Amino acid sequence: MPLIFAKATKTSIPVIVLDSSALEDWRDAQPTRVRNWVTSSTFTAALGQVLMVPSDLGEHLCALMGYGSASKRKRGRFALADAVNKLPEGCYHLQQGLPEADLDEQALGWLLAGYSFEKYRKCPLPAVQFKVPKGVNAVRLEVIAAGEALTRDLVNTPASDMGPDQLEAACHDLAERFDAQVDVITGAALLVHNLPLIHAVGRAADQQPRLIDMRWGTQGPTLTLVGKGVCFDTGGLNLKPGNSMGLMKKDMGGAANVLGLAQMIMALDLPLCLRVLIPAVENAVSSNSFRPQDILTSRKGLTVEINNTDAEGRLVLADALALGDEERPDLMISMATLTGAARVAVGPDLAPFYTDSDALAQVLSISGARVADPVWRMPFWDPYESLIEPGIADLDNAPAGGFAGSITAALFLRRFVEQAKDYVHFDIYSWQRTAAPGRSKGGLGQGPRALLEALPHLLAL
C-alpha cells in the first residue's frame, strides 16, 4: 500500500487522542450513551490503546486513541503508530487531542505503520488511511516515508537478489525517476581508474566489484553522500562464524540509507548539487581473495596493512571518500554498517556520528530529536590515531586489542578526507531487531531524516 495520506474529500471517521489525564474530563462532557460506552469499556487512554465508539445507528461515531503519559511516550517513538493496525478498515482524520509539536511525528508514524515488505510473501495490513492533519506538510512527510520505504526494501532484500548488479540497477532506477546521471566503474576498470581497495575487496566474488557514481542538480552548494555497499560479507578469509553471518545481507545498509536520503532530496527538489558514491562489492572467499598481512595501496596513496579481511567496509569507503574529496564538496557524509563496536557503545536505536565541527554536530542532534531520528555524537579522538598506524604501512585496517573500535574505524576514514569543507561519518545498524511502532522488523533507515532536516541549516539552503 502506498505510504500516502487519504484524499481530503474522502469520507472519514474522526479520531480523538486522549492522554491519561484528559480521559475523565472528556468522557464526562459526552452524551450519556457515549459516556456509558466508554465507562463500560476497558479503555484507559493507555499508550496505543484504541476504542471505537458507535453512533445511535451502529456506525462508527469516532475512534479514541490513548496517548498515555509523557513518561511513557519518552520511552519510544511514533507513539500512535501501533494504534493504526488496531483500527477497523477505513479512512480517519484527527479531530482533536494531539499537541501541535507532536503532529509531524505521529502523522509520519501513521504512514510508516503501512509499510510491509512483500517481495517474497504477502503480508497485507488492514486498509487504514489517514487524512493529513491540519498544519502538517503532507508532501514532505510522504516523501520521507517513501525514502524510508526504499531504504527498508533494499536492506530487506537478500543477497541472492541484491548483489552488486542489483544494487547498481536500483541506482539506475532511482536516477531515471529524477533525471540524474549514473556512471559505473566495474571490475578491472577499477584498477585503471585508481580505485584499488574497492577492487581488492570485491574481486573474489562472482559479481564484479564496482563504484557507482550518481549526480543530480547543477546549482547550489555541493553535497556528496558515500554509502557502504557490501552486499554480503562473509568476512573473507577471516571467515565470520555462522551466527555472525546471519544478518550480513544488511551490510549494504549504508548504501541503502544514502539512496533513501538521495530520493528525499531529489523528490523535494532541494537547491543543491548532489553526488552519491557507492562502492558495491561482495566480500567473498576464493583463490584470489585479499589476505591478512597483505599491504594495499589506496587511491589516496596511503598504504594499508590488512590485519583482518572482515574489516573490509572501511577499505571500500576509503577509495570512495578519496574520490569524492577531490571535488572539495561543501559537505561530505559517509554512512556504513561499519562496526559492532558502535552497537556496544550506543545500542541498536541510536545512530552514532563523527564530525570535527561542533556547530554541525549541534544542528544534527537538534534535527534528529525534532524528527524522531535519534543520533548521537561520538569523538574523533586524536590520541587514538596511533592505534591505526601499524609501522609497516601507513594504516592498519583492524588494530589489535579491539578497544574503541568504532572510533578507530572513523579515524581511519577521516584520513581520506582532507579537502571537503565539512565531513560527517555515520556508523549505523540499519536494522530493527523486533517490531516497534512505525518500525517493522527488518531493514531500517537511521540518519536520513535527521540529515534532511539539518541540510537547510548546514548548507544555507
Give the role of each language-model region.
Residues 1-229:
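Short amphipathic alpha-helical segment within the helicase RecA-like ATPase core
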Residues 168-461:
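A generic structural signal for tightly packed, nonpolar segments enriched in small/aliphatic residues
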